[in-house]
Design a protein with these regions (language model features):
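Membrane-embedded helix boundary and interhelical linker motif in transport proteins
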Residues: 35-90, 136-140, 242, 269
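Helix-loop-helix "hairpin" substructures at the membrane interface of multi-pass membrane proteins
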Residues: 80, 140-225
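Transmembrane helix-bundle core of multi-pass membrane transporters
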Residues: 95, 99, 103-163, 193, ...
Length: 327
């Protein structure tokens, strides 16, 4: 009976979970660009997410228009991606380490931007685009509606951009860097640009979340990469067989973030210890990442293995290794 009573409170919490899922979904789209398109493990996300929130709040507190504040936050995120990209391409630092270095530096930068660990902003005094206060209202300024529109614009712009020559060059760089260089594509430039675009989206998500919750915190991006990966993996697991278009794949990532937050809300409603949420998230991501490997190693059909063995045998007959005498 206690479980049923708790579940009865779930519908009232779903609008907030959906709104948060949509906001984090924009960040997850940024993670998708580096993780799937560029094939780069970018850990800048944990820092650039907080940078977007910090810059947006401080711009609003200084009297700036909300749209201008969002633009400045996006540019700040773009700059963080540029730094990571240059550390990787110009200085030769491995991508994962370059992201860690930028993330570490951004902690101090975010503290400097805000002047302290957190800054709050009142929806009654400032014209915010979205707010937690409006999440249950049936109006145009409802955060769910506003973020759906923002997500649609983001997906539309990315779909157009990755259809251009420059966007196709970024996709080719992630797919096969050696072949891209052979075709005259500047892979270093594409990596830097891809990281910049990705972190610009992450910062946009951070800016929207800071408005939604009414404050920016220096640690608000901690664990963001795990949430982003969870959204990407859940979206692919649920929709990969039916969503083949690039725009639909991006939409599936956003839906994956919504599913993630609904599950989190369900778990919290059932009385799960909130202190263990990060452990749960990490475990879910680890399992979903391991599933493709387990499928190939333990659950592949014998017919497929026989075909692979036959192909290897055929190749060895067609291209025999030179004997020791021939050498």
């Amino acid at each position: 009976m206690e479980i049923i009573a708790r579940l009865a409170n779930l519908p009232g919490a779903l609008p907030g979970a959906c709104a948060q899922g949509l906001i984090w979904g924009i960040m997850a789209i940024g993670v998708y660009l580096t993780y799937r398109i560029l094939d780069v493990a970018d850990l800048t996300v944990d820092g650039s997410f907080g940078t977007g929130g910090a810059v947006c709040v401080m711009c609003l507190l200084s009297g700036m228009n909300v749209w201008a504040a969002l633009l400045v936050a996006v540019l700040a995120g773009l700059a963080t991606g540029l730094v990571t990209g240059l550390l990787h391409t110009f200085m030769g630092i491995p991508a994962i380490l370059a992201g860690i270095l930028t993330q570490l530096a951004l902690y101090s930068i975010n503290l400097k931007i805000m002047g302290k660990a957190n800054q709050s902003i009142n929806v009654d005094k400032y014209g915010l685009l979205i707010s937690l206060r409006w999440v249950k209202e049936f109006a145009l300024h409802n955060p769910i509606i506003m973020v759906i529109l923002a997500t649609a614009v983001v997906i539309g712009v990315l779909y157009w951009f990755f259809g251009t020559e420059l966007g196709c060059g970024i996709r080719a760089t992630g797919s096969n860097p050696a072949m891209s260089r052979a075709q005259g594509i500047n892979t270093n430039f594409n990596i830097v640009l891809g990281l910049a675009v990705s972190n610009a989206l992450v910062a946009l998500s951070g800016a929207l979340l800071s408005q939604y919750q009414g404050f920016a915190d220096v640690g608000m991006g901690r664990g963001a990469i795990v949430i982003g990966l969870a959204a990407v993996i859940i979206g692919e697991a649920v929709f990969s067989r039916i969503f083949h278009n690039f725009a639909l794949k991006l939409a599936s990532v956003s839906i994956g973030a919504i599913i993630y937050y609904i599950v989190i809300q369900l778990v919290l409603t059932l009385g799960f210890d909130a202190n263990l949420l990060k452990l749960l998230s990490a475990s879910v991501v680890a399992v979903f990442l391991a599933v493709p490997y387990w499928k190939g190693k333990y659950f592949s059909k014998p017919v497929k293995k026989a075909k692979e063995d036959a192909k290897k045998c055929l190749r060895s007959k067609m291209f025999p290794k030179p004997s020791m005498q021939a050498r």
